[in-house]
UniProtKB/Swiss-Prot annotation:
Function recorded in the entry: Self-assembles to form a helical, filamentous nucleocapsid. Together with capsid protein 2, wraps arounds the DNA and maintains it in an A-form. Capsid proteins probably maintain the DNA in A-form by non-specific desolvation and specific coordination of the DNA phosphate groups by positively charged residues. This certainly protects the viral DNA under conditions such as the extreme desiccation of its host.
UniProt free text on domains: The N-terminus projects into a DNA groove.
UniProt keyword terms in alphabetical order: Virion
Protein name per Swiss-Prot or TrEMBL: Major capsid protein VP4
Record organism: Sulfolobus filamentous virus 1
Amino acid sequence: MPSRRTGITTEDAITKYSVKAKTEQTAYKNATKDMVVQAQNIMNFYSVVNQALIPWLNAHGVGGNLRILYRQLANEYVKVLNTKQSGEVIKRLKIALRHKYWLRGLDEAMLDEFMDYIDSLKSTTTNYIIFNMQSSK
């Protein structure tokens, strides 16, 4: 007997729901796979960033909260470098980042040196910068 509100029989509603549920499950599985791959890419990115930056931070005697600030700066700067922007926009973003972290208490000369160090690490145009460890020696 069809529903008074919708006019659909119970069997039709069950059939519709079961088909809809399967497509939603497939979409969820695919989205979950993509999210896992993206999370793995991000984790690989951070491990490579740490491998490249920690020796520099150790060599310059940076520790404690300053180390966290330098790593935040590196992550933000890498995001800037990964944008598909022209040289002028990147220059301005670099100046803005430099100023932001200078206001947060980082030394101006070391900021310049740190950003130059990040620039010296070879980058690619993928979503995450891949550091070339040979260039850091």
